[in-house]
Amino acid sequence: MIESFSFGSYVIVYNGQIYNTKELTKELKKNDFEIKTHSDTEVLLKSYILYGKDVVNYLNGIFAFAILDTNKKEVFLARDHFGVKPLFYTNVNNTLVFASEIKALFQYPGVERVLDSQGISELFGIGPAHTPGTTIFKNIHELKPAHFAIFNESGLHIKLYWKLKSKKHLDSFEETCDKLKYLLKDSITRQLVSDMPLCTFLSGGLDSSIITKFASDYCKDNGLPPLDTYSIDYVDNDKNFIKSDFQPNSDNYYIDLMTKNLYTNHHKIVIDTPELADSLEDAMIARDMPGMADIDSSLLLFCKNVKKEMTVSLTRRMCR
């Protein structure tokens, strides 16, 4: 959901969630900023006013945002560390046009729908992966993860603000387990703060099971209702499932194991093959490009069904 907010000569448009809003709010109040809403959009904008372009070094979350400074006649754009939130842009006659979806850019007069040969080659060769910053359309770019950009009269200037560093691992096995547990719990519980109905996707795999475990424990420990969890299945999958080295058991075995032992309210969404086929084009349109076919259509149908009851879901998904 895109949020907007203005303060003085500054205007922000923002998509995402900041997980350390409380810490940022404390610092803002120390510096005589008044916070009038419960929105992280206000906190983000006023943090930018306080820290300038260095604000990205203080953010813990997933985000893509743009801030206009009408006094400086300057736009500041930034994307989160791992590129969870998308941000695309193009330049038309020295005018910066940006959006969370490529299709939105084409609504601006002068933005042409021309395929890029290099982008198409990557689509067929390594798709859905691609070279960071590129798309399948000419002159349509994505702001790379962990980058910010400044657009003013001198043009567009892009800079890397963070890079994952490799360090020698010196901790013992026990210390490693303790640290990993702490980091996972901290990360997951921070993301459980939501004004909207929240759930987790549960496939029975390691990632979704870990997320669901910590999230359900949080609900139980804080006297909240059981955590809603969702999984996907297919008509006649129980009859047609074939074991392999890659998948020796059906997902349902592990899903049932988790839901029986955790504080959850589980929902299973069952999809039929014709639905998958009928949704292939819709899934491609949603992505703005061809993707992983049946996987994308499954995810689209799954999310549409979950959206009937939920707004926010914690899940492990590949960044775009």
Language-model features: locations:
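Active-site adenylate/phosphate-handling loop in enzymes that bind or generate adenylated species
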Residues: 279, 293, 301-320
